[in-house]
Amino acid sequence: MQEKKTALSAGASGIVGRGIAERLVGDGWRVLCASRSGGGHLPGTEGVAVDLLDAEACARAVAPHAGITHVFHAAFQPAPSRAAEVAPNLAMLRNVVEAVQQASPALRKVVLVTGAKFYGIQWGASSTPCRESDPRQLPPNFYYDQEDWLREASRSARWRWVNLIPPFVSGYAVGNPMNLVLGIGLYAAVCKELGMPLRFPGSVGAYEALHQIADARQIGAAAAWAADAPAAEDEAFNVT
């Protein structure tokens, strides 16, 4: 009988995390969704109430789940500045992985999802195409801290890691304003109500610029592949 894989999904209430959780459930996984309330999780998943910023709380919440085989991390904690984002976002990843590592000897893969800021788009124009081998841009950037921590922590661990790097992401999530599709939909609705044509609201430069968008379902498929693919170990992969 084939072993049923068990995932702990951090950030499952967001667009990316939801896309991953839906894909895993469809593939027959047992999926635990970590959130502060432990509720509001997707059909077919189980809620785990935990504050990811609290290391002791993470350890207590994960302790009953000794069979976790994979961690999927797409959680994000906003902060007033790039520098201020580093500590909480690194802490959430570290707290989750260390808690699972302690509770579950079955852990074998950590799949981190970062994003296009890995290539410095927040600072202006970036190279096209972006490649995983591109040099890092000006720090601070919590994506770099997260990947560096995984690389170092995995050296003496049984588990391996993967960093998935998508561009702009579209998809569905409840109560999440970080959604390009939602913004376009609201703009279109306002234009319709006012009887205005749906014109591009930005500059000529923005209109003519090359952009890529990944659907959350595509990221979910990539995460499911990265979970067990022999080629997906200890490196980053663009998802476009």
What are these regions (language model features)?
Residues 2-27:
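N-terminal Rossmann NAD(P)H-binding glycine-rich loop of SDR-like oxidoreductase domains
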Residues 10, 202-209, 235-240:
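Glycine-rich Rossmann NAD(P)(H)-binding loop
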Residues 28-40:
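Conserved glycine-rich Rossmann-like NAD(P)H-binding loop of the short-chain dehydrogenase/reductase
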Residues 39-95, 101:
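NAD(P)H-binding glycine-rich loop region in Rossmannoid oxidoreductase-like domains
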Residues 71-73, 83-84, 91-142, 162:
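Conserved Rossmann-fold NAD(P)-dependent oxidoreductase catalytic core, especially the SDR/UDP-sugar
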Residues 136-167, 172:
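Active-site Tyr-X1-5-Lys
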Residues 157-221:
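NAD(P)-dependent short-chain dehydrogenase/reductase
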Residues 219-240:
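Mid/C-terminal beta-alpha module of Rossmann-like enzyme folds, strongest
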